[in-house]
């Protein structure tokens, strides 16, 4: 799903680092997976991969399954992780993360 944007080895390392429940940290994940160093264009491409229902927003249910977008066998985020991730990214308080909010979150 992220071919041409992210390296498989980086994805594997990032997923391994947050295997344990409640160990997910979006800043560490985006850095490890190599997304925070990418261009605005690549970050936008990644957003549209994560936006599974193509609504133009990443909603809470998509955040919960965020890691599975990177690898089908990855775990779901816990409710606490999901809520913290949403709170960090949802700067306008509409309950979802838009493409611009996502770009800010990745570069945070």
UniProtKB/Swiss-Prot annotation:
The entry's cellular-component GO terms read: cytoplasm
Q: Which parts of the sequence bind Ca(2+) 1?
A: 51, 53, 55, 57, 59, 62
Q: Which residues carry this modification: N-acetylalanine?
A: 1
| Binding positions for Ca(2+) 2 per the UniProt entry | 90, 92, 94, 96, 101
Which positions fall inside the EF-hand domain?
A: 38-73, 77-108
Keywords for the protein's UniProt record, in alphabetical order: Acetylation, Allergen, Calcium, Metal-binding, Muscle protein, Repeat
Note the InterPro entries from the entry.
Answer: EF-hand-dom_pair, EF_Hand_1_Ca_BS, EF_hand_dom, Parvalbumin
What family does the Swiss-Prot or TrEMBL record give for this protein? Belongs to the parvalbumin family.
Role played: In muscle, parvalbumin is thought to be involved in relaxation after contraction. It binds two calcium ions.
Instruction: State the PANTHER family in the record.
Output: PARVALBUMIN (PTHR11653:SF12), PARVALBUMIN ALPHA (PTHR11653)
Remarks, miscellaneous:
Is regarded as an important allergen.
**Which named protein is this?**
Parvalbumin beta 3
